[in-house]
């Protein structure tokens, strides 16, 4: 919610944060306390669990993890929505053991990310429960999410799902991230998390950051401690081996 300037809550829905570990995943046991804490009728009643695959920390839900989470959601009367902005990266990761059809049956709704894997704009929402589609178009229209030339988005996804292009591009991004991670470790950098997808997180000394600023752009992810910061690099389908190797050559050695 922090990166979306309160967009979810602006629609009238309340976000109930769940504290997760370093892998960025929500587990079944994390849900029960939230539900129990909100049984008071004066508090917001939980209705849906929102997760991302790949997660914000670049990790991937396994088939067993997603199955267990979905089962718990059903037991608690909660819907499960999966943010698939990086779904291509997740499903082509070496850490993944799910096919797209298997994944699709382990949640109530999800979207197939396009913006982060080749399209100029847009995502493709998949709703698995027919009762959730009632009035959905009107809802989109009311929120200003119906495009005049929406067919253009369909054309882009048609191209992405021809000849496995969507997954080829995501797989390439993952491979370039792995190359970058290996190169950073060889230069003495410390990884904050071993990400199997196209996000790379490194913990760097704050006094070294000016040297990094001089050679590339990156994102400050979070403070690590008083003298270190976690920074993020992201690769994509356009990232080449030459791009990665050139960046590694320019970055400081931290041995």
Regions found by a protein language model. Give the residues of each.
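PLP-dependent aminotransferase-like
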Residues: 1-45
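Hydrophobic beta-strand scaffold residues
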Residues: 15, 80-82, 191
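Active-site phosphate-binding strand-loop segment of PLP-dependent enzymes
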Residues: 26-84
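Active-site C-terminal subdomain of aminotransferase-like
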Residues: 46-55, 60, 97-197
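Active-site-proximal loop/turn and secondary-structure-junction residues that shape catalytic pockets
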Residues: 55, 86-88, 116, 239
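Active-site pre-lysine segment of PLP-dependent enzymes
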Residues: 63-71, 75, 86-109
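Conserved C-terminal alpha-helix-loop-beta "cap" of PLP-dependent enzymes
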Residues: 178-253
């Amino acid at each position: 919610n922090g990166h979306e300037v309160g967009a979810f809550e602006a629609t009238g829905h309340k976000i109930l944060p769940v504290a997760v570990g370093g892998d960025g995943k929500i587990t079944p046991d994390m849900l029960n306390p939230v539900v129990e804490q909100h049984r008071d009728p004066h508090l917001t009643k939980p209705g849906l669990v929102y997760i991302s695959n790949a997660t914000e920390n670049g990790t991937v839900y396994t088939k067993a993890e997603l199955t267990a989470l979905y089962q718990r959601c059903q037991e608690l009367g909660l819907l499960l929505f999966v943010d698939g902005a990086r779904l291509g990266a997740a499903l082509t990761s070496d850490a993944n053991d799910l096919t797209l059809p298997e994944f699709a049956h382990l949640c109530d709704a999800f979207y197939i990310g396009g913006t982060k894997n080749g399209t100029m704009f847009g995502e493709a929402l998949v709703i698995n429960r027919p009762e959730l589609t009632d009035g959905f178009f009107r809802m989109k229209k009311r929120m200003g999410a119906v495009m005049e030339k929406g067919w253009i988005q369909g054309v882009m996804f048609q191209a992405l799902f021809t000849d496995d292009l969507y997954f080829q591009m995501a797989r390439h991004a993952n491979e370039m991230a792995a190359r970058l991670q290996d190169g950073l470790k060889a230069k003495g950098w410390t990884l904050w998390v071993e990400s199997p997808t196209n996000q790379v997180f490194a913990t760097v000394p704050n006094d070294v950051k000016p040297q990094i600023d001089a050679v590339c752009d990156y994102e400050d992810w979070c403070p690590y401690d008083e003298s270190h910061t976690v920074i993020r690099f992201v690769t994509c389908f356009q990232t080449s081996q030459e791009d990665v190797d050139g960046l590694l050559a320019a970055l400081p050695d931290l041995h």
